[in-house]
């Protein structure tokens, strides 16, 4: 299958070619997002489209895992934010999440995802599209309005702690000689896993971890 069929990141120019010429046109990519969702349990595919502060457009999808309860699923918003982190984005500006099976209604994220978004730097400024199929345009509402009387990282973390999508280094290392442990730019899978772990966000448990995988075609993935 064509690689573009599994495309989750669009430059501003690529997004424009898909009809995303201004914020209200983010839904033009929701069909692509929903087609990539994996919902074998509920059959309810959710897509999310977000614009990062850099101007690039990202897709997110829900992922359900057969044999496990639904609370182990990855929500589309969480998928999208992880996508931002893996691409070294500094923040999320706009977000559109479908709440209907036909992809024509857009609403606020679930309570779990609203709290998850609070882990991002300047989260309260994130604008979320609210639109029903009966509205021509809809409107953007800030997370500040959608999550009143909120709990935030500032309530528990030390002042100045790096938040999600902010630069961080967990100061982890692997045992071995200098020749065996290189850098995140080398071809060693363990070095890529170490780099992922050093960028891991786990401020409440202090248990950072990372993983790197390589497929049969030589492509590698990290998280």
From Swiss-Prot:
Annotated catalytic residues: 77
Domain CMP/dCMP-type deaminase residue range list: 21-154, 184-223
UniProt cofactor note: Binds 1 zinc ion per subunit.
Pfam families: dCMP_cyt_deam_1 (PF00383), dCMP_cyt_deam_2 (PF08211)
Catalysed conversion reaction: cytidine + H2O + H(+) = uridine + NH4(+); 2'-deoxycytidine + H2O + H(+) = 2'-deoxyuridine + NH4(+)
Superkingdom, natural source: Eukaryota
Cofactor(s) it depends on: Zn(2+)
Binding annotation for Zn(2+): 75, 110, 113
Alphabetical list of SUPFAM superfamilies matching this protein: Cytidine deaminase-like (SSF53927)
EC number: 3.5.4.5
Gene Ontology MF, one: cytidine deaminase activity
Keywords on record: Hydrolase, Metal-binding, Zinc
Sites where the protein binds substrate: 62-64
Entry annotated with the keyword rRNA processing: no
Gene3D superfamilies: Cytidine Deaminase, domain 2
Keyword Ribosomal protein among UniProt keywords: no
Record-stated family: Belongs to the cytidine and deoxycytidylate deaminase family.
PANTHER family tied to this protein: CYTIDINE DEAMINASE
Designated name of the protein: Cytidine deaminase 3
Organism name: Arabidopsis thaliana
């Amino acid at each position: 299958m064509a690689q573009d069929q599994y495309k989750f990141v669009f430059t501003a120019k690529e997004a424009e070619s898909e009809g995303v010429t201004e914020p209200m046109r983010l839904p033009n990519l929701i069909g692509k997002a929903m087609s990539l969702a994996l919902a074998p349990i509920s059959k309810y595919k959710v897509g999310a489209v977000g614009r990062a502060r850099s101007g690039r457009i990202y897709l997110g999808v829900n992922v359900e895992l057969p044999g496990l309860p639904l609370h182990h699923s990855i929500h589309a918003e969480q998928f999208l934010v992880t996508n931002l982190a893996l691409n070294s984005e500094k923040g999320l500006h706009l977000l559109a999440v479908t709440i209907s099976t036909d992809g024509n209604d857009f609403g606020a994220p679930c309570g779990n995802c609203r709290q998850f978004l609070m882990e991002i730097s300047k989260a309260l400024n994130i604008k979320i599209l609210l639109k029903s199929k009966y509205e021509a345009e809809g409107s953007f509402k800030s997370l500040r309005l959608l999550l009143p009387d909120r709990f935030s990282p500032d309530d528990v973390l030390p002042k100045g702690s790096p938040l999600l999508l902010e630069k961080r280094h967990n100061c982890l290392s692997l045992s071995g000689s200098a020749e065996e442990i290189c850098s995140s730019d080398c071809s060693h899978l363990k070095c890529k896993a170490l780099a992922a772990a050093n960028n891991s966000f786990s401020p409440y448990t202090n248990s950072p971890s990372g993983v790197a995988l390589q497929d049969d075609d030589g492509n590698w993935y990290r998280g």
